[in-house]
Structure formats: structure tokens, C-alpha cells
Amino acid sequence: MALPLPPGLTQNEVAFLAEMEMVTVVPRQRLDSIDLLGGKTPQLRPPHRAQLPLWLALLLKKQRRANIVPPAWMHPASLAEIIHRETKEDPEAFSPPPPPPSRALYSQPGTARRLNPSYLDDFTQTQQDSQQDPNSILSPPFLPSNVAESPAGYLPYHWLEVAEALLTHAGDDMPAPAGEVRSLLRDLVEVRAAKMRSSTSALEGFGDAYLTLRGVGAMELAENRAFLAGLVDGVRKIGASAEATRREEEEEARRGGDYGGDGDEDSDEDMGL
């Protein structure tokens, strides 16, 4: 009998989904458009850059038909800036995700706005028909993101998976020696892992304690899902036990009050004291 699968995505599944992220390539030879499930790919015409899914870019790189342009956030200066921010400027929180992308609406060409649910609905229906809150601002993974367009100083949702894939299969395309980039990524992973473990201390308070995961990547969530789920479940059980004990003590105190003072006075009167 097969064992039940754990809830959530596994690390291999997260890495597979990350291969759908877009990256920038510089083609070495001409290639016509390819029909994919997500639409047609752009025609490749050297030396013009184009954006392709990561899996296709890695395939062309393996065939020596294109070079991959590393995203801006993978530059050593950007990684060093993120590490400094997470260790010196704000050691308690994770670095914020990239700002929501801007896109012009079909109904208002020439104007670019930050994407939110109302603007997303405008691509398929009029903005007046949208039932979403126009003031709500979402971020990846709840908005379409693009690793290739993520600015320096911010980590996209699939930053760890994309970085590992590019360093493994396109290390010669890195803006610096692959060893330097890998060392910075290792330091960043260790800093964020330690921060993830230490941030769980906020759950020790049973009141309004909460754990914020803003800025945490997909692979980090997959790696720590079992730990966090077990921790939350343990805190919930401890809190339920403490609440049950408190209610029992209150019930005993109330019963003691009912049988206490008035009963003693009545017994004294009966004895003529």
C-alpha cells in the first residue's frame, strides 16, 4: 500500500515549476517561432535578445544555439546588497519581493500601472465589471512575475531554483566567476534559513502571535513546510491544552464561590452562633 503524499509541493515539483520562468537569451543562430501550450515563442534573430522559458533556454544553451543573460538580481553587487540588508539593515525580516510589474491596459493604451486584481481582470473584461478591490496590491506568486525583469536588489519567488539551474548549466554566462556567485548565494541561503528558524519564536506567544512569510521563496517554503506545519500544530495543541486548563480552573473557582461563603453563614446561624 502506497503511503499518502505529504501536503504541498515537493522540492522537485517546485524546481519543475520554476522552469516555466522567463529568462533572457542571446541567440547564436536563427530560429523560427515555436508553438507551445503557453503561446508562441518569439523568433530568434542574432544578436537580438529574446525572452524564453527557462527550460527552453537551457536546452538551447546545451545545444550551443544561445547564451543566457543572467538576471540583474544574480549579479554579485545585487546579492551582496541583499545580504547586507538582511543582516544589517533589517535582520528580523526577509528582503521584500520585487515590486508588482507595470502594464498598460488595453482600454487605456500608453499608460502603465501597477498590476492588481482589477487591472488583471481588465485584460478579459471591462474594469467596471470587476468585483475585486482596486486598492489591493498583490505580489508574486499571486501576480504574474518574470525572473528576467526582476530588478537588482530584490529576490523573485523562484530565485533559488533559477539560480541553481543557471549556475549548473550556464555557469560560463555569469557576470562574475561562478564560484563567487555560488558563494554569495550560499551565504544568502544560510542567512535566510537561520532567520526562518529564529522567526518561529514569535509563535511562542499564544495570543495574537503570527509568522510573516513575506519575501520567502518557493523552494524555501517547500523545504520548511513540514517544520513550520509541525510547529504550528504543536503550538495549537499547547494553546488548546492551556485554554482547557484555564477553563477548568475558572469552573472550579466558580463552584467554590457557590459553595463557600453563603454556606458557612447558614451553618453558623443554625448553630446559634
From Swiss-Prot:
Q: Name one Pfam family in it.
A: Sld5
Annotated localization: Nucleus
- What ranges does the record give for the region Disordered, renumbered to this chain? 88-110, 240-273
One biological process term from GO is: DNA replication
Q: What is its main location?
A: nucleus
Q: Which keywords belong to this entry?
A: Chromosome partition, DNA replication, Nucleus
Enumerate composition-biased segments (Acidic residues). Answer: 261-273
GO CC aspect terms: GINS complex
- Xref: Gene3D superfamilies: 1.20.58.1020, 3.40.5.50
- State where composition is biased (Basic and acidic residues): 244-257
Q: Which PANTHER family match?
A: DNA REPLICATION COMPLEX GINS PROTEIN PSF2 (PTHR12772:SF0)
How does this protein assemble? Component of the GINS complex which is a heterotetramer of div-26/sld5, drc-1/psf1, drc-2/psf2 and drc-3/psf3.
Name the protein family: Belongs to the GINS2/PSF2 family.
- Function summary: The GINS complex plays an essential role in the initiation of DNA replication. Has a role in chromosome segregation.
Q: Output this protein's name.
A: DNA replication complex GINS protein psf2
Q: Which species?
A: Neurospora crassa (strain ATCC 24698 / 74-OR23-1A / CBS 708.71 / DSM 1257 / FGSC 987)
